[in-house]
């Protein structure tokens, strides 16, 4: 197995160093590719000063899927792993990855543990059955693909600002590529998030949800029901925050407008993308769609 590890980053200097240190220790011999968005925190200088990075690709786009695809393009391994810049791979990570791909799986993932006051918590693999298709979701910052699977997918869909990993899970299911789960392929997240969303982020979330469901399955009752179910449950939860005094009615209404607008845009754009790529890979905005992602490239191989 020739392993390449792609680390997409944007203003992640504070945590990226620990990510790279762990890869050097726990995945020795792996080709390491850092795909850096338009960072303003000195990430490029920090990476150039290290001797354990093989390729640094700079991209001008802030979208995570663009950085992922730029890194995948630069990688040469027959297995390509994606590791988030805020994750530290654990002991035995590489061995668990190799073991999973030695079987029938073409993709493998594992838990991403978060530091919380009560200790470390890990997500279990999430599986759903949608329109007769069994979908296994994966952790986008802790996943490895055989090159053949990535080629069949044409990488990630660059239309998506968020939800790129979930979209890819739907497309893997359509292409009949199994996804393995290995608890030993674990990574640890040292930095948490605030858990909140702005009105604009609500819009992006629901544009992504509507887009990927419509693109992958078309407009059908199952799709409509899932979109409305998600939106309805979160509308009720946010309304309760207003009642408790944790939010204000204007914020609730503003978020609601963004959600409705995001759904409308996502449905429309999903239909266009579905028509543009009628193959099971459903990726009109993949790696092969453009070759101008990188604005600079440093190759020390």
Predicted regions and their residues:
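Short, well-formed alpha-helical segments that are part of the catalytic scaffolds
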Residues: 10-26
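A short, conserved alpha-helix in the catalytic core of glycosyltransferases
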Residues: 142-145, 149-154, 159-186
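Cell-envelope/extracellular polymer assembly enzymes that use nucleotide-activated donors
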Residues: 2-4, 31, 167
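Acidic helix N-cap motif at the loop->helix transition within catalytic regions
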Residues: 14-18, 41-49, 92
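Non-catalytic, C-terminal membrane-associated alpha-helical segments of glycosyltransferases
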Residues: 201-208, 218-301
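Glycine-rich, basic loop-to-helix element that forms the pyrophosphate-binding segment
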Residues: 45, 58-75, 96
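Short aromatic/hydrophobic "clamp" motif used to bind/position activated sugar donors
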Residues: 80
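Conserved donor NDP-sugar-binding/catalytic core segment of glycosyltransferases
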Residues: 88-120
